[in-house]
A protein has these predicted regions:
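Secondary-structure end/capping motifs
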Residues: 230-314
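A bilobed periplasmic-binding-protein/Venus flytrap-type ligand-binding module shared by bacterial periplasmic
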Residues: 120-130, 216-232
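Short, glycine-/small- and polar/acidic-enriched structural segments
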Residues: 6, 27-169, 175-179, 183-187, ...
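Short, solvent-exposed loop/beta-turn-alpha elements that line the ligand-binding surface or hinge
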Residues: 59-64, 132, 210-213, 228, ...
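Conserved C-terminal helix/tail region of periplasmic/extracytoplasmic solute-binding proteins
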Residues: 302-344
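N-terminal export signals
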Residues: 1-17
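Extracytoplasmic/periplasmic substrate-binding proteins
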Residues: 193, 197-216
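Bacterial lipoprotein signal-peptidase II cleavage site
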Residues: 14-30
Length: 344
């Protein structure tokens, strides 16, 4: 899940319309490496600016792919990867780690768009005012189905359980927070937090990354079978994605407009909020001191260790070897060293 940057509160029908849209990138003739199916974690908003640049500028076909299909969520991508209906899923370390730990799912993370995850418990200062994990006690928290394992991980990492509060099943419309149905709402710092604040409310965030769960997110997640059978295609995909996200980092507002005017044109996205969300993700989530040194999507040994430790604190028992296979990305940068210089 991600949030709806600029999606008007009360826009559940907009979400429903996007969920029925099952294709995104256009396929071109040719392409020795075939077509890849990509499951997005959320709707086609600015969160996927890099993918939109890669598609619209022809980076996927330039890399040798016949095309890439972008299927909107919400989804963790686990079911799609295991069923074979997706070759790549934009997911997160908790969702993939949980599947590996609990189901022995043969999945791997091969890179991460977000060096820092943007999940938060969003509240309104004059209502829920959830500023610390202790503030969750006794509160009603709206949790979407795709975020159940994430919220359970947050509770476990902070010594809490669901019996300490009330979990309210919700969809992705933050109006339930505004109207008082819930005190807190699982959201993205770059999306719903902006949306609700834009409505004039003073918002309070409880970021997962600052409260026991500093895991990577918007991860490029694949099956071990895909790594074995489609390695060259996945590497080509990563090359195109690096180029796309280089553009998104250097011109976040243009990336936002690709969502507003093209890929998400039927969603009613708010231009100002979309630009703000795209800028925040470009400056605070996608890049870091480590990406400057190692390149976009890389996950340093330190960040791997922090991710594994955060999962362990939430009761998810996996090793770095279980969760990550960064050899494809290593090969991409070794073969294309010019891609390191994303900050043009």
């Amino acid at each position: 899940m991600a949030g709806v940057a600029g999606l008007a509160i009360g826009g559940a029908s907009v979400l429903a319309s996007c969920a029925s849209d099952s294709s995104g990138a256009s396929a071109a003739d040719g392409g020795d490496l075939g077509t890849l199916k990509v499951q997005l974690s959320w709707i086609k908003n600015e969160e996927f600016a890099g993918e939109f640049f890669a598609d619209s500028k022809g980076y996927f076909t330039e890399a040798g792919l016949a095309g890439v299909t972008l299927t909107p969520g919400p989804s963790t991508g686990v079911a799609e990867l295991l069923s074979g209906s997706a070759d790549v899923a934009l997911s997160d370390a908790v969702s993939i780690g949980t599947a590996i730990a609990q189901q022995e799912a043969p999945l791997k993370i091969i890179g991460a768009t977000y060096q820092k995850n943007p999940f938060t418990v969003l509240s309104i200062k004059t209502a829920g005012n959830i500023a610390t994990p202790a503030d969750l006690a006794g509160k009603k928290i709206g949790v979407q189905a795709s975020n159940t394992s994430l919220f359970q991980a947050l509770l476990a990492a902070n010594g809490l359980s669901e019996s300490d509060l009330t979990v309210v099943p919700v969809e992705y419309d933050p109006s339930v927070l505004v109207n008082g149905t819930v005190d807190g709402f699982i959201a993205y710092l770059t999306n719903e937090a902006i949306t609700v604040a834009a409505e004039g409310y003073e918002v309070v965030n409880l970021p997962f990354a600052d409260n026991g769960l500093p895991f990577v997110a918007e991860t490029f997640s694949v099956s071990e079978q895909a790594i074995a059978e489609k390695r060259d295609a996945l590497k080509a995909f990563l090359v195109a994605e690096i180029k796309g996200w280089t553009d998104a980092v250097n011109d976040p507002e243009a990336g936002a407009m690709l969502a507003v005017e093209n890929y998400g044109k039927d969603l009613g996205l708010n231009e100002e909020s979309s630009k703000k969300g795209a800028t925040i993700q470009a400056e605070e989530l996608v890049v870091s001191d480590e990406t400057v040194s190692n390149g976009l999507f890389t996950i340093s040994e330190t960040l791997q260790s922090e991710t594994i430790a955060s999962l362990a604190g939430a009761g998810i028992d996996v090793t770095a070897e279980d969760l990550f296979d960064l050899t494809l990305l290593d090969e991409v940068y070794e073969e294309n060293p010019e891609l390191m210089k994303y900050a043009a």
